[in-house]
Amino acid sequence: MIDVGLRIDVDTWRGTRDGVPNLLSILQRQQTRGSFFFSVGPDNMGRHLWRLLKPRFLWKMLRSNAASLYGWDILLAGTAWPGRRIGQGQAEVIRATARQHEIGLHAWDHFAWQTWAGVWPAERLSAEIRRGVEALADIVGQPVDCSAVAGWRADGQVVAAKQPFDFTYNSDCRGVRPFRPQLPDGSLGTVQIPVTLPTWDEVIGSSVTREGYNDFILDQITQHQGVPVYTIHAEVEGIVLSEMFERLLVEAGRRGIRFCPLGELLPQDVTQLPVGKIVRGHNPGREGWLGCQQLS
């Protein structure tokens, strides 16, 4: 049996309202658990439209057919009107998720983090994390013990800003296996569980067809030499591609693949994990920089 961490990112109002309940039903039918990471502040995702001026982002939007994939309400959210507070309006969905699955913080404001985390000072990074942690903890009535930054926008400064929150683990970068990140001061930080597999929007339309996507991902898992972690999005696999995602789970079971919460991938003794750093890098199919694992 191959254990694969299932990370579910929830970026928007619609993804929370519509995508998460669909995913909860699918996961219950397939007797599968995962880790949901919620954005809980304003939904300003439509403000990413300016990035269409960047060729790599424009190509990504075109090949993934973003308008039909996400819907115009997501693509325009927070542009002509203030973004709705996701946690405030969709609290019951988040609480229902917490009763069945591992949950953690994705972001307070997903758009702001993805756009500005690379230039914010440490104080602003800490304030954004704290705002999201406090909002999510108030919703679920329990401490938040894991997190995964929006857009994998993480580096040494971001990892250091997370230290005071005492998370059990973070999932802030792309890589091959769990590790202990070295902080800028030389000390070791909270365990990182990197995402190791490509997402739908990174490969569709370039090297993979819609019809061949499930086989592609399952083949990637069986060939993986590290600790596989797969990310889906409530806005995609929870809505337009929900039937395809359920077929993926069914076929995974036939191939001896078990999806699980990320926390279940941690060894009993985390001090035995390798040491490394999170550095800025690039990933095929994704516009802009993101955090990448660099093992010592």
Swiss-Prot record:
Keyword DNA damage annotated: no
Known InterPro entries for this protein? ArnD, Glyco_hydro/deAcase_b/a-brl, NODB_dom, Polysacc_deacetylase_ArnD
Name this polypeptide is given: Probable 4-deoxy-4-formamido-L-arabinose-phosphoundecaprenol deformylase ArnD
Question: Example GO biological process term?
Answer: lipid A biosynthetic process
Q: What is its EC number?
A: 3.5.1.n3
Which residue intervals define the domain NodB homology in the entry?
Answer: 2-260
Instruction: Check the record and name the Gene3D superfamilies matching this protein.
Output: Glycoside hydrolase/deacetylase
Q: What class of enzyme is it?
A: hydrolase
Q: In which pathway does it act?
A: Glycolipid biosynthesis; 4-amino-4-deoxy-alpha-L-arabinose undecaprenyl phosphate biosynthesis; 4-amino-4-deoxy-alpha-L-arabinose undecaprenyl phosphate from UDP-4-deoxy-4-formamido-beta-L-arabinose and undecaprenyl phosphate: step 2/2; Bacterial outer membrane biogenesis; lipopolysaccharide biosynthesis
Q: What molecular function terms (GO) are annotated for this protein?
A: hydrolase activity, acting on carbon-nitrogen (but not peptide) bonds, in linear amides
- The yes or no answer to whether the keyword Lipid metabolism is present is yes
Q: Which branch of life, at top level?
A: Bacteria
Q: Which GO terms describe its cellular component?
A: membrane
Q: Pfam families, alphabetically?
A: Polysacc_deac_1
User: What's in the keyword line of the UniProt record?
Assistant: Antibiotic resistance, Hydrolase, Lipid A biosynthesis, Lipid biosynthesis, Lipid metabolism, Lipopolysaccharide biosynthesis
List, alphabetically, the PANTHER family matched.
4-DEOXY-4-FORMAMIDO-L-ARABINOSE-PHOSPHOUNDECAPRENOL DEFORMYLASE ARND-RELATED, GLYCOSYL TRANSFERASE-RELATED
Q: What is known about what this protein does?
A: Catalyzes the deformylation of 4-deoxy-4-formamido-L-arabinose-phosphoundecaprenol to 4-amino-4-deoxy-L-arabinose-phosphoundecaprenol. The modified arabinose is attached to lipid A and is required for resistance to polymyxin and cationic antimicrobial peptides.
Q: Which family does it belong to?
A: Belongs to the polysaccharide deacetylase family. ArnD deformylase subfamily.
Q: Which reaction does it catalyse?
A: 4-deoxy-4-formamido-alpha-L-arabinopyranosyl di-trans,octa-cis-undecaprenyl phosphate + H2O = 4-amino-4-deoxy-alpha-L-arabinopyranosyl di-trans,octa-cis-undecaprenyl phosphate + formate
